[in-house]
């Protein structure tokens, strides 16, 4: 877990959020001064085909309905690195690659479903009338009560461990 000293303030032009992101993306070896050489090729996210995570238009599949998908869909190293960055999950092992490819193969089975003539839904409860209530604050100014639920806080923020590292780690045997 990375803790920021209480008196530390972000430099002008930087927010606390950007500092936390910088620290969270730094390996512990980088913080101690002993840097290990990273052999992975870095992705230039400005040159991505889709810089936004939300597609701007529907994706047209090259697979036709009813066509069987290949048994294994290979995933290149650059895609794995992007997935690791977005999901904060380490996929370095061969077992993780197999699990990822199995998940892609399972999800690609939906391409064989014939949806011709079926209108898209906005919600699964489209036939039910959903009533909305007025947006009124009923119990405001409870920030301190909410922050008491956190194990670690820093300047009115929850402190979370970077990535998928739990706050309390079990001792290794």
Curated annotation (Swiss-Prot):
Pfam families: GatC (PF02686). Residues 51-70 are annotated as: Disordered. Its EC number is 6.3.5.-. GO terms for molecular function: ATP binding; glutaminyl-tRNA synthase (glutamine-hydrolyzing) activity. The keyword Mitochondrion applies. PANTHER family: GLUTAMYL-TRNA(GLN) AMIDOTRANSFERASE SUBUNIT C, MITOCHONDRIAL. Allows the formation of correctly charged Gln-tRNA(Gln) through the transamidation of misacylated Glu-tRNA(Gln) in the mitochondria. The reaction takes place in the presence of glutamine and ATP through an activated gamma-phospho-Glu-tRNA(Gln). Subunit of the heterotrimeric GatCAB amidotransferase (AdT) complex, composed of A, B and C subunits. HAMAP family: GatC (MF_00122). This is Glutamyl-tRNA(Gln) amidotransferase subunit C-1, mitochondrial. It comes from Culex quinquefasciatus.
